[in-house]
Amino acid sequence: MKTFGRVLTAMVTSFNNDGSVNIENCVAIANHLLDNGSDGLVVCGTTGENPTMSRDEKLALFNAIAKECGHKGSIIANVGSNDTMASAEFVKEVSKIDGIDGLLVVVPYYNKPNQQGQYLHFKTIAEATTLPIMVYNVPSRVGTGIFPTTLVQLHNEYPHICAIKEASGNLMIASEIKRLMPGDDFMVYSGDDGLTLPMLSIGGCGVVSVVSHIAGKDMNAMIQAYESGHNYKAIRIHQALSEIIKAMFITTNPIPVKYAARKIGLPVGKFNLPMCEPTADEEAYIDKALAEYLK
């Protein structure tokens, strides 16, 4: 199966004290991730605090990372919003950038469209680009989710809608997607670090990861072990990752991972409100799980 890679890191964004994006620091973070287990990056996603970034900042960051880091791995630009026409126009701009390998498009949030509305949303965006599209299904943040049957219809009509970041937490949804589309032309990525190994067992091809900021090599090794038939090795790595995975989601993402990335020396900068620093208790929990990675 031709994929974007096994481990795609949903990378944090480095902000200056005034809240603007620090492009130089972001490129440094991207290079670090691609040198330490990540096969690709998702830029300006949830972990990247994209709601606090302007359109121009996103375009500048896509350009910089594609130019400086695109030779090292896949670059996926997050372009989704809950405004279909605005998303389609943004997609046209992003599609002009050399080195962008694909687009992440979330199910529209807050306005909670039904399945027909979701179909029309993705149809409109697909007609605005020829780049591969990864649908992002995350009902916990969106308030609704895309059905496997809707996804099949979209893929059949627009084959470049060819992947999903499945973050519902429900493995039966991923299983149904693979039952309906068993071939190699549709990629299912786990959107939950802790479900990566079980997702592989039902036909998934990798993970869009947060934990890979800290343990990218281990995450990639787990997937490679499974793919090579070394199931017990994969299970051991999965179990060894459990504490850092729990720590990275002790509170709302990206609060823990940005704190942890700073602790390992990455120039992540400040949070932009409404994201903020973890509490003292949360810091202590993260520090305990992180200790092994600071040796």
Regions found by a protein language model. Name each.
Residues 1-2, 295:
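Basic/polar N-terminal segments that are highly enriched at the extreme N-terminus
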Residues 2-9, 14-143:
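Active-site beta->alpha loop and helix N-cap motifs at the rims of alpha/beta catalytic domains
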Residues 7-14, 32, 36-38, 93, ...:
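C-terminal alpha-helical cap/extension of soluble enzyme domains
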Residues 26, 58, 62, 87, ...:
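A general structural signal for well-ordered alpha-helical segments in protein cores
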Residues 36, 60, 64-69, 93-97, ...:
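Alpha-helical structural signal in soluble globular domains
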Residues 73-74, 133, 162, 185, ...:
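Secondary-structure boundary/capping signal
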Residues 127-128, 141-249:
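Catalytic alpha/beta core domains of metabolic enzymes, predominantly
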Residues 137-138, 161, 272-273:
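Glycine-rich phosphate-binding "P-loop"
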